[in-house]
A protein has these predicted regions:
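N-terminal prepro-regions of secreted/extracellular proteins
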Residues: 1-39
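Post-signal peptide N-terminal regions of Sec-secreted extracellular proteins
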Residues: 28-130
Length: 130
């Protein structure tokens, strides 16, 4: 096989692998009685929208100003913990700042970090952990 044909096959193989994995969303699956902890951080003083799966598998959302200042005080964090009920299979959380700036989320299961994400967009910031 000539070199150009080999390179074409290699590129096609890589493209097929990437296409197969594109769009595959990972989900944080939980078992009954797992301890779940959500953590959110943002620029201090920012009002943010938070949406997450609750202990019963439903969705909760609201607008919050996180008050737990960290580091030099330019960032604030908050958290929520719960014990997963028998109706919960997957958990996720999202944080949005419609004015832009830093947003961060993380999910811990039984004290182990299983998902984290951040966004620093200047106009509209949103990130999700799932």
């Amino acid at each position: 096989m000539n070199m150009l044909k080999k390179a074409g096959i290699a590129c096609a193989s890589v493209a097929a692998i990437l296409a197969a994995s594109a769009g595959t969303a990972s989900a944080v699956s939980v078992d009954e009685y797992d301890d779940v902890k959500y953590v959110w951080c943002t620029d201090s003083g920012a009002d943010v929208q938070i949406e997450n799966t609750n202990a019963y598998g439903g969705t909760e959302d609201g607008t919050f100003r996180l008050s737990g200042r960290i580091g030099d005080g330019t960032r604030s964090c908050g958290w929520q913990t719960f014990n997963a009920g028998d109706d919960v299979s997957y958990v996720s959380t999202w944080i949005t700042d419609e004015d832009g700036g830093y947003v961060y989320c993380a999910i811990y299961l039984d004290g182990v970090l299983v998902s984290q994400s951040e966004d620093r967009s200047s106009y509209y910031s949103v990130t999700g952990c799932y």
